[in-house]
UniProtKB/Swiss-Prot annotation:
Disulfide bond residue pairs: none
The protein's name in its UniProt record: S-protein homolog 3
Lineage: Eukaryota, Viridiplantae, Streptophyta, Embryophyta, Tracheophyta
GO biological process: rejection of self pollen
Entry similarity comment: Belongs to the plant self-incompatibility (S1) protein family.
Signal peptide segment: 1-23
Source taxon at top rank: Eukaryota
Positions annotated with a glycan in the UniProt record: 32, 70
Main location: secreted
Alphabetically ordered keywords of this record: Glycoprotein, Secreted, Self-incompatibility, Signal
InterPro entries named in the record: Cupredoxin (IPR008972), Self-incomp_S1 (IPR010264)
Amino acid sequence: MKNILKTQVHVVVIYLLIKIAFSQVKTDFDVNWSTSKMVRITNRLGDGLTLNLHCKSADDDLGLKILAPNGSWSFKFRTSIVGTTLFYCHFTWPGQSKRFDIYDDDRDGVRSHISCINCIWDISIQGPCMFSESDHAFNICYDWNGNLRT
């Protein structure tokens, strides 16, 4: 009986030590496998044009938004741990209908050369331009086919 009680005490002590060790490891080495991001879109069409936009991902439909001239809208999300996050937007204004991948993990994620945490976009008739945090300017510009403009 004494040996059984002693064994049970040892098991409990070992269990508690393991639990404490793992809780400490989580605290010290807590890796956030997904990253929090923010996308802001501003209407820079000019000529007093209103911009309608509808953004989606595979999991989220963010609904129709209507931006007055120079108006902005933003949303936040967490990226996928496998690096496949994609949000695309359908943009319309009088006489035009365009689509653009407003956040693409391959282009904007931590493994890309343009990585952004706050992905800030100006939408013009020529195409979207993203704010460069290193240059402090909207100089990462694309045409509506997704090609980088020079």
